[in-house]
UniProtKB/Swiss-Prot annotation:
Main location: cytoplasm
GO BP, one annotated term: carbohydrate metabolic process
Catalytic residues identified in the record: 195 (proton acceptor)
Localization in the cell: Cytoplasm
A Pfam family hit: NAD_Gly3P_dh_C
Family in the record: Belongs to the NAD-dependent glycerol-3-phosphate dehydrogenase family.
Taxon lineage: Bacteria, Bacillati, Bacillota, Bacilli, Lactobacillales
Organism: Lactobacillus helveticus (strain DPC 4571)
Gene: gpsA
One Gene Ontology cellular component: cytosol
Pathway assigned to this chain's UniProt record: Membrane lipid metabolism; glycerophospholipid metabolism
Task of the protein: Catalyzes the reduction of the glycolytic intermediate dihydroxyacetone phosphate (DHAP) to sn-glycerol 3-phosphate (G3P), the key precursor for phospholipid synthesis.
Keyword entries, A-Z: Cytoplasm, Lipid biosynthesis, Lipid metabolism, NAD, NADP, Nucleotide-binding, Oxidoreductase, Phospholipid biosynthesis, Phospholipid metabolism
Catalytic activity as recorded in UniProt: sn-glycerol 3-phosphate + NAD(+) = dihydroxyacetone phosphate + NADH + H(+); sn-glycerol 3-phosphate + NADP(+) = dihydroxyacetone phosphate + NADPH + H(+)
Binding site for NADPH: 11-12, 109, 144, 260, 284, 286
Full protein name: Glycerol-3-phosphate dehydrogenase [NAD(P)+]
Length: 339
């Protein structure tokens, strides 16, 4: 049994926490909405984020970070990208007092705007300076709604330290979620983050009335952009993007109604504004934040990312969706395979 602190008790945090409790671990969920914490502890439900579902009764919740971290051997970050750095700073303060050195695992999929840092880079900076080996990222085709029902899936767990990846693989795996180790930490993170931008584009196509051929073409060219960014900016391995955290996560996020990024894109394709969509979603749309960082990165390194750049313009420069699609299809001819 491993003592685990799950930081973030939204839909994915709650499901992962419950899954880890299913696996026989001692799990404490940390969140800042007291009513959610009380509901989890009293009724083992989280109706604010997950309707008609119960957590494992052994999973506890608290709004006290020190309580959540007390004795934790593994700390799982399942937070919005914008919250990771401030929470990581607070985690460092607690760990400095106790002297504990738990393994840090991130299930957050994003790139921090401004700094353009991956989540593992933020955790390394704020918690374990110069010790990236203690960070593991998990990413793959895994919607909370499906994992909650114990539907089958597979997820990559990546670290620069193979033994730490194997530890996470052993702790997290069960009979409905299979984990595979990977040594390309940044590649796994880039795939998980940037696919959210492509999912917004996929939703926009559906909102505009386009069919399966258009969606398949978009996903394929979107994967090319993700790979290009991962390899040329972050030094990722190209083959990583053919795996669970690349094409696997991209497929499910671009095709499932459970994908909040896809749903947001569909509404934008139907004519809704980004402000309207974000106010009415009730959940974080990570792709809308990540696209800012991706746009900055593509311009900084002159990386060809026409889909991501178009999504940035639609969301933040209010360009016309139909015109962006027209311009995309009228671009100069290019070879299909290039980095």
């Amino acid at each position: 049994m491993t003592k685990i602190a799950v930081l973030g008790n939204g839909s994915w945090g709650s499901v992962l926490g419950s899954m880890l409790a299913d696996n026989g671990n001692d799990v404490t969920l940390y969140g800042n909405i007291e009513s959610v914490n009380e509901e989890i502890n009293k009724t083992h439900t989280n109706s604010h984020y997950m309707k008609d579902w119960k957590l494992n009764e052994n999973a506890k919740a608290t709004g006290d970070l020190e309580e959540a971290l007390n004795g934790a051997e593994l700390v799982l970050f399942v937070l919005p990208t914008k919250a990771v750095r401030i929470v990581a700073k607070n985690v460092r303060k607690v760990l400095d007092k106790t002297g504990a050195k738990p393994l840090l695992v991130t299930a957050t999929k994003g790139i921090e705007p401004g700094t353009k840092k991956l989540i593992s880079e933020i955790l390394t900076e704020e918690v374990y300076p110069n010790d990236e080996d203690k960070i593991v990222a998990i990413s793959g085709p895994s919607h909370a709604e499906n994992v909650a029902q114990k539907d089958l899936t597979a997820i990559a767990c990546a670290s620069t330290d193979e033994e730490n990846a194997k530890k996470v693989q052993k702790i997290f795996s069960n009979d409905y979620v299979r984990f595979y180790t990977n040594d390309d930490l940044v590649g796994v993170e880039v795939g998980g983050a940037v696919k959210n931008v492509i999912a917004i584009a996929a939703g926009i196509l559906v909102g505009q009335g386009y069919g399966d051929d258009a969606k398949a073409a978009l996903m394929t060219r979107g994967l090319a952009e993700i790979t290009r960014l991962g390899v040329n900016y972050f030094g990722a391995k190209p083959m990583t993007f053919s795996g669970l955290s690349g094409i696997g996560d991209l497929i499910v996020t671009c095709t499932s109604v459970n994908s909040r990024n896809w749903r947001a894109g569909k509404q934008i394709g139907e004519g809704k504004s980004l402000d309207y969509v974000l106010k009415n979603m009730g959940q974080v749309v990570e792709g809308a934040t990540t696209v800012k960082a991706v746009h900055e990165l593509s311009e900084e390194k002159n990386i060809d990312m026409p889909i991501c750049d178009a999504i940035y313009r639609v969301l933040y420069e209010n360009t016309d969706v139909a015109e962006e699609i027209k311009q995309m299809m009228g671009r100069d001819p290019k070879p299909e395979i290039r980095l």
